C-alpha cells in the first residue's frame, strides 16, 4: 500500500495548484515544514457545509475534495477521513488537530473557529519559547 501511495504521489502534480486547492499530499508536507497548514476536506455534494477559513491568519489554508478523481481517494485513505467535512491542522509536517463532522455532515462553525484560532495562537507562541 505504501509503495502504491508513493508511486501515486510521484505521478501527481506536487506544486502546481490554485491558491487554495490541494493537488497532492506532498504539497501539504512541503508547505508544513515551515508553517501551520490547515486542510479542509469535503465532498462535492457537501460543499455547503464548508467553513469559511479565509480570515484565519498565520496559517496556510487549503481545501481538498474526496471526489477529485486524481487524488481524492489517496487523500481520504492517507489521512483516514471518516466523514466530511474534516479539518486537519498540521504544524511542521505533523498533524496536531482534527475536527470531524458527525452524522449531520456539518461542523459547528463558531466552536471550530475558536478552537482553530486558539491552536494557531499556541503555534505562534511556541516560536518565541
Annotate each predicted stretch with a short phrase.
Residues 78-90:
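Structural micro-motif
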Residues 19-23, 66-69:
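Short gly/ser/thr-rich secondary-structure transition/capping motifs
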Residues 69-75:
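N-terminal post-signal-peptidase region of extra-cytosolic proteins
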Residues 1-4:
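Positively charged n-region of N-terminal signal peptides that target proteins for export
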Residues 21-62:
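Local sequence-structure signature of Cys/Sec-based thiol-disulfide redox active-site neighborhoods
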Residues 89-129:
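Non-catalytic, surface beta->alpha helical segment in thiol-disulfide oxidoreductase systems
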Residues 9-18:
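Hydrophobic h-region of N-terminal signal peptides that target proteins for export
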Residues 41-44, 66-67, 102:
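Active-site-proximal beta-strand/loop segments in catalytic clefts of secreted hydrolases
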Amino acid at each position: 500500500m505504501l509503495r502504491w501511495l508513493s508511486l501515486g504521489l510521484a505521478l501527481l502534480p506536487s506544486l502546481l495548484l490554485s491558491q487554495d486547492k490541494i493537488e497532492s499530499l506532498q504539497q501539504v508536507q512541503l508547505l508544513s515544514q515551515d508553517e501551520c497548514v490547515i486542510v479542509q476536506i469535503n465532498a462535492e455534494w457537501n460543499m455547503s457545509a464548508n467553513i469559511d477559513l479565509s480570515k484565519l491568519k498565520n496559517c496556510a489554508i487549503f481545501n481538498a475534495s474526496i471526489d477529485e478523481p486524481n487524488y481524492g481517494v489517496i487523500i481520504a485513505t492517507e489521512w483516514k477521513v471518516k466523514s466530511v467535512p474534516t479539518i486537519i491542522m498540521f504544524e511542521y509536517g505533523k498533524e496536531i488537530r482534527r475536527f470531524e463532522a458527525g452524522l449531520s455532515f456539518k461542523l459547528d462553525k463558531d466552536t471550530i473557529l475558536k478552537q482553530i484560532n486558539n491552536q494557531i495562537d499556541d503555534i505562534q507562541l511556541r516560536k518565541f519559547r
